[in-house]
Amino acid sequence: MTSKNKSILDDLLSDEPIFNSNEEEDEVLKPLLDEINMIDNLNIKLFTRSVLLQAKMFWVIPSSFSGKYHPPDEHNGGGNVLHTKRVVRAAKVISDSYSLTSSERDLVFSACLLHDVTKGVGDESCSDPTSFTYDPLHPYTVGNFVKKCQENDRKYTSEANSSTLYIDEETVQSILRLVRCHMGPWSPVPETVPVTYLDMIVHLADNMASKLHYIVDGDNVLKERWILESQ
């Protein structure tokens, strides 16, 4: 058997799905591809990709709907994506300090990428990015959205080729637990404040990213600097 044939056979016998990057999907995910590719486990990576691809509002809403919170360069359309990128990067720094295992990092990075996918409520066609409103319960509605993604996969693809169905339910729930804890002491449901160190890492990464302008500038935030640097 040639090495090429052996490689093909190994892929077919593997527990992981065979993944060939889709250029059209990659174009949609381009702003977050570096962060998505920080996930080592292919099943978790494909699951995360699939949910992000189906979260149309996620890509067009700002990170702050009132303009009172988050860095000024996140206040317009697409700001939620920039915030998410910063959350994952902050999580990586904290994960390095904790010397997390690869499997722990994958859960943290996936949760950070998905933590705000249902933050905005509005027109699902995304025809008017200004029409969205903030969902204060978004840490919990992510779970319902994931179920919807799984239902879509059942309708349109086989389980063997599905991005969301291939992942085991225990892993999904571990990721969703971290998502539910990302608001920390400001959680709308007290029962989901961070308890474990993974819970806390996701919360701290989100909190630090949302206060990045204060970390850099202090109380006197130089809005011009943030707006100019984002252009």
For each predicted feature, which ranges?
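Polar low-complexity intrinsically disordered regions
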Residues: M1-S14, E27, E151-T164, S230-Q231
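Acidic/His-rich, divalent-metal-binding segments that scaffold phosphate/diphosphate chemistry
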Residues: T2-C126
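Divalent metal-dependent catalytic cores for phosphoryl transfer on phosphate-bearing substrates
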Residues: G67-H83, R89, I94-V221
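A glycine- and charged-residue-rich anion-binding loop/surface
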Residues: D217-Q231
